[in-house]
UniProtKB/Swiss-Prot annotation:
All ranges on the Cytoplasmic side of the membrane: 1-17, 72-97, 161-168, 237-272
Keywords, alphabetical: Glycoprotein, Membrane, Repeat, Transmembrane, Transmembrane helix, Transport
Pfam families from the UniProt entry: MIP
Species this protein is from: Pelophylax lessonae
Protein encoded by which gene: AQPA
A Gene Ontology molecular function term of the record: water channel activity
Segments on the Extracellular face: 36-52, 120-139, 189-214
Descriptive protein name: Aquaporin FA-CHIP
Compartments in which it is found: Membrane
């Protein structure tokens, strides 16, 4: 673990997560700010709200796809603690790198939200993209929504980035971006769609409002962990040997292996 800490590539990856997170949050939350959703649901207002939801969803999805294409080769472009946790559990990164990524993501989100706070200071009712529960949505329901939308995102990420596969066609960043957009189309009306604890953290810090903030950490982390475990142990199994996993978690990324067609085969993992 100490040897990885000294590598330049390690710090380049952490810096890439920080900078890409700033751009992602600035673009996506910036697209959402200024939309004053009406209280009364008249016909023309409902159409306007639907259009705004599509705008925000596309902004989140396209910005993630853009950042993934830009820095994916440097850091993997996680840009989400839930994705980082999923990659950790599927033995794609070490524990040290996961911790540093999450710190970088949270700091990047705070910086981006602070920039937006200055730029949009003249907006009325400026929530800075703060996540919260819609009227009539309970904490348990909101938690369930966050778990499910993050589950589909992390399942997509670990599946399309599985280096043992050779059947992935098309653009991987685009697939992940569409998954992010899909999650927002589903969840915006219920929770504002967190699906990303760091993104939610930035807004909560700048607005000093942590009401129900735990939902936007617990939900995505449960969803991300569940997706990685189900993919890694059921859908496309690797080794179940804890010793091998511990070596990867302490020494870094694993080598590439072929995904055997036999459902009963476990793929051995070794640290580089």
């Amino acid at each position: 673990m100490a040897s990885e800490f000294k590598k330049k590539a390690f710090w380049r990856a952490v810096i890439a997560e920080f900078l890409a997170m700033i751009l992602f949050v600035f673009i996506s939350i910036g697209a959402a700010l200024g939309f004053n959703f009406p209280i009364e649901e008249k016909a023309n207002q409902t159409v306007g709200r639907s259009q705004d939801i599509v705008k925000v969803s596309l902004a989140f999805g396209i910005s993630i796809a853009t950042m993934a294409q830009s820095v994916g080769h440097v850091s993997g472009a996680h840009l989400n603690p839930a994705v980082t946790l999923g990659c950790l559990l599927s033995c794609q990164i070490s524990i040290l790198k996961a911790v540093m990524y999450i710190i970088a993501q949270c700091l990047g989100a705070v910086v981006a939200t602070a920039i937006l706070s200055g730029i949009t200071s003249g907006l009325e009712n400026n929530s800075l993209g703060l996540n919260g529960l819609s009227p009539g949505v309970s904490a348990g329901q909101g938690l369930g929504v966050e778990i499910l939308v993050t589950f589909q995102l992390v399942l997509c990420v670990v599946a399309v980035t599985d280096r043992r596969r050779h059947d992935v066609s098309g653009s991987v960043p685009l697939a992940i971006g569409l998954s992010v957009a899909l999650g927002h189309l589903i969840a915006i009306d219920y929770t504002g769609c967190g699906m990303n604890p760091a993104r939610s953290f930035g807004s909560a810090v700048l607005t000093k409002n942590f009401t129900y903030h735990w939902i936007f950490w617990v939900g995505p982390m449960i969803g991300g962990a569940a997706a990685a475990i189900i993919y890694d142990f059921i859908l496309a199994p690797r080794t179940s040997d804890l010793t091998d996993r511990m070596k990867v978690w302490t020494n870094g990324q694993v080598e590439e292996y072929e995904l055997d067609g036999d459902d009963n085969t476990r793929v051995e993992m070794k640290p580089k």
